[in-house]
Amino acid sequence: MKPYLFDLKLKDTEKLDWKKGLSSYLKKSYGSSQWRTFYDEKATSELDHLRNNANGELAPSSLSEQNLKYYSFLEHLYFRLGSKGSRLKMDFTWYDAEYSSAQKGLKYTQHTLAFEKSCTLFNIAVIFTQIARENINEDYKNSIANLTKAFSCFEYLSENFLNSPSVDLQSENTRFLANICHAEAQELFVLKLLNDQISSKQYTLISKLSRATCNLFQKCHDFMKEIDDDVAIYGEPKWKTTVTCKLHFYKSLSAYYHGLHLEEENRVGEAIAFLDFSMQQLISSLPFKTWLVEFIDFDGFKETLEKKQKELIKDNDFIYHESVPAVVQVDSIKALDAIKSPTWEKILEPYMQDVANKCDSLYRGIIPLDVYEKESIYSEEKATLLRKQVEETETANLEYSSFIEFTNLPRLLSDLEKQFSDGNIFSNTDTQGQLMRDQIQTWCKFIQTNEFRDIEEQMNKIVFKRKQILEILSALPNDQKENVTKLKSSLVAASNSDEKLFACVKPHIVEINLLNDNGKIWKKFDEFNRNTPPQPSLLDIDDTKNDKILELLKQVKGHAEDLRTLKEERSRNLSELRDEINNDDITKLLIINKGKSDVELKDLFEVELEKFEPLSTRIEATIYKQSSMIDDIKAKLDEIFHLSNFKDKSSGEEKFLEDRKNFFDKLQEAVKSFSIFASDLPKGIEFYDSLFNMSRDLAERVRVAKQTEDSTANSPAPPLPPLDSKASVVGGPPLLPQKSAAFQSLSRQGLNLGDQFQNLKISAGSDLPQGPGIPPRTYEASPYAATPTMAAPPVPPKQSQEDMYDLRRRKAVENEERELQENPTSFYNRPSVFDENMYSKYSS
């Protein structure tokens, strides 16, 4: 038996100019001056050449390669454009496959990229069937593989390209072609077994495979049967006859081998019934055998079937005497589909990878907006990862620097080495006490030179400034209720922040006052040293510990060097991580996965971020090792100090040393809190000055407006003096909007200062170590100016006093602005307390 495969025809097309289409698209997207930056003329010419080859007169194997590559280019472009492929403004023209004279010359033109893809995919499937036909006499296995690929292509077409104007691409027709390819691949599998030596063990296998082949041809037959008589059947007319013949023939073949299987199991009666059914189906196929006579030996199979029938009937009559069922259950034969088709994506995958780099160059100017949005989300994920590592690294570096600075480790090790290198196990110098004394001296200098060292005085200053502001605000008329409310709200917020700030240093006022007085601090510190014996007894000295101390010092020096190396390694790893994150680009990956959901994209981002884990792990390892090594150094230093002191210490001396350490720790905490207090308090004072200037300026404006109203009661009011917009900055006197209308309009506006307050901010800040949380404070200086609300030009001021007032105010504001620019802070990062949206209840 020889296989017969349907002859599918290719679709024809008209020439296409990709150079014109892509250049036109890029010009519209980037303009005539920039589009060439994203245009690769050589790659575009290669794309035109590739399409011409894909639709040329080449061998099927070469055509398949050209078409698969061309489709890969289309797929990469589709990833970028999606359903917006019509923006290319290109005419894709394709002709229907000519199976009849009625289809000759039928062509369809569309602007969508999906139409070009579907037509190309149709031709790819047809080419696979042509390759299968070429190799059918040499290797069934190769033909089965190509028919399976054709089946996958047609199936993908039927499921993903719907409502096409082309008859070839209509969903029901591509599904019909998919079933034909599937049935033919299954048929080749059966014929491969039939043409080899058949054993009795293969009867049931052939029966099941033939049953599956029959079912597949049944689907094709049903499709042709459903078409009305007045509608032309898709394909050649002989297809229907051939499908009908194969349907009955493989049903007969399945029943025949099932009968042989029953005979092997000594179920002769059922076997005879299935052979009778097989004969009926074979006879049903004979009227449709016209196109298959040269491929299937119908007569030979009929003779074999008749011979087997007679043999079984004779055996049953003389030996078995089993009853023969009148009707057989053909469904009892289980169909076995031997075709496992790969997905179309799997077939295309190697070609997609092969042209990926070329597509990145060719389509680099075509990137959808949603890809940029998703890339920004991924960039934020990377930034979060980097910030975390930077913060951990900075914290570790600060821990290292603080440890080295606090212990003065290099000098300490040098002094200890000198002390014990000559075998001197004891020195009457209290090393630990000397280190404490040096540190306290540094702290005293810091406190005594700081202008905010008197905490009570600073508290009184703040209270006085609040009182000044409240006195001014209480004197303002009711029509300024909105501005008064805003200023009071800012005052309340600043007061709350100051209370937290002062709460940080109040528990340490005693220690701060001590550090502010050299006499008192050294008197107090010396109290802890009075009970230290000035000279020990020689009997208390254990000089056998000298070698051990030197060994410990050697280990500490090694650990100190390792700490320095760890710090350098951590910084180097962080630099590498920053470079990798900055150079990481997943635009291509996002384009390929453009259709994924947010959950799938999140999983994709997590997978992509895993490539940074090695460097992150190395950074974390250096941090962990540093902490462990610092603890080890501390333990060894304690052991050295213990060994270098007397063998036995009185309990009273131990108590004094412990009290001294506690006293030193309290001073350290006090200095930490005062450092935070001293850095934040100037910002608070500056803010109160700003509120005071605003309140004073508002009161002055109201007074001037009142005088103007009284003096011009019977005439239109002149506008307020114009203000220099450059002087309107945070920290200076606030500016009111310039008005060119009468005072009645000014009063009705309520002298609104909302525009001026946009840049003043109060927000909660960062937590303080070893104390209550204190919000970070800053005052961001950004110009705000009143803008005229009417077209009439402002009338210049008439009084010289106002000119002098404006000049003084402008100079003061410029000085404050220059000071803020030289010392910027990060306070008040929340939206401004003067934001109009926060006062909506007053904006009726």
Curated annotation (Swiss-Prot):
Coiled coil residues, start to end: 547-583
Keyword Ubl conjugation carried by entry: no
Annotated ranges, domain BRO1: 4-400
Pfam families referenced in this protein's UniProt entry, alphabetically: ALIX_LYPXL_bnd, BRO1
InterPro entries from the UniProt entry: ALIX_V_dom, BRO1_dom, BRO1_sf
Gene Ontology terms describing biological process: ATP export; intralumenal vesicle formation; late endosome to vacuole transport via multivesicular body sorting pathway; mitochondria-associated ubiquitin-dependent protein catabolic process; positive regulation of protein deubiquitination; protein deubiquitination; protein localization to endosome; protein transport to vacuole involved in ubiquitin-dependent protein catabolic process via the multivesicular body sorting pathway
Predominant localisation class: cytoplasm
Region (Disordered) residue spans: 703-734, 763-844
GO cellular component: cytoplasm; cytosol; endosome; endosome membrane; extracellular vesicle
UniProt biased composition (Basic and acidic residues): 812-821
Key words of the record: Coiled coil, Cytoplasm, Endosome, Phosphoprotein, Protein transport, Transport
Protein role: Class E VPS protein involved in concentration and sorting of cargo proteins of the multivesicular body (MVB) for incorporation into intralumenal vesicles. Fusion between endosomes and the vacuole will then target the cargo proteins to the vacuolar lumen. Acts as an adapter that recruits the DOA4 deubiquitinase to the endosomes, leading to deubiquitination of cargo proteins prior to the lumenal sequestration. Its association to the endosomes depends on SNF7 and its dissociation requires VPS4. Interacts functionally with the Pkc1p-mitogen-activated protein kinase pathway.
Additional remark text: Present with 10200 molecules/cell in log phase SD medium.
Protein's recorded name: Vacuolar-sorting protein BRO1
